Amino acid sequence: MGRFLLVTLSLLVGAFSLNEANSCCCPQDWLPKNGFCYKVFNDHKNWNDAEMFCRKFKPGCHLASIHSNADSADLAEYVSDYLKSDGNVWIGLNDPRKQRTWVWSDRSPTNYYSWNRGEPNNSKNNEYCVHLWALSGYLKWNDTPCKALYSFICQCRF
C-alpha cells in the first residue's frame, strides 16, 4: 500500500512538473502552448510591420501560426481575454508570391486551415495576408490586404 501511494504521488508530481515546464518560461500575460509563448499586441500595424515587430522582439519570433482546432480555440480564447480593442488580429499566414499559395511566416507546415465561409476570396485581387476574424470570435480566418492596420499575435520561444 505504501509503495502504491509513493508511486502515485511520484506520478502526480511528475505530471505537475511537466505542466509547469510548458508554462515556466513564458512572460506574464503570454499564453504557453506546445513549447511556444503567444502574446497579442494591441498596436495596429500592417502585416509586414507586425511580422517585423515580432522578429525584432526576440530572435525566432514570428506572427503566430496555427496548426489545429485545439490551437485555434486556445488562441481565440486568449485573444478575446487580452485584446483591449475590438477588431481583427494578424496571424502569420500570407501569400508572398501572390499565387494563392499560403505559407506561414515561420516556415512551419501549412497543414491546417480555418477559413471563414467563402474565404479566401482575394477580393479586388489584393488580399495576400490573413487575420483572425473578430466577428467569428477569432476562430475563422479571412484574407485581406496586407496594408490594413490590425492588432497582431506573436509566437516566440523563451
Curated annotation (Swiss-Prot):
GO terms for cellular component: extracellular region. A motif (Mannose-binding) lies at residues 119-121. PANTHER family: MANNOSE, PHOSPHOLIPASE, LECTIN RECEPTOR RELATED. Its main location: secreted. GO terms for molecular function: carbohydrate binding; metal ion binding. SMART domains: CLECT. Expressed by the venom gland. Belongs to the true venom lectin family. Keywords: Calcium, Disulfide bond, Glycoprotein, Hemagglutinin, Lectin, Metal-binding, Secreted, Signal. This is C-type lectin mannose-binding isoform. Mannose-binding lectin that binds to and agglutinates rabbit (but not human) erythrocytes in a calcium-dependent manner. Disulfide bonds join C26-C37, C54-C154, C61-C156, C129-C146. Ca(2+) binds at E127, N142, D143. Glycans are attached at N121. InterPro entries: C-type_lectin-like, C-type_lectin-like/link_sf, C-type_lectin/snaclec_domain, C-type_lectin_CS, CTDL_fold. Residues 1-23 form the signal peptide. Dimer. Probably disulfide-linked homodimer. It is found in: Secreted. Residues 33-155 form the C-type lectin domain. Pfam families: Lectin_C.
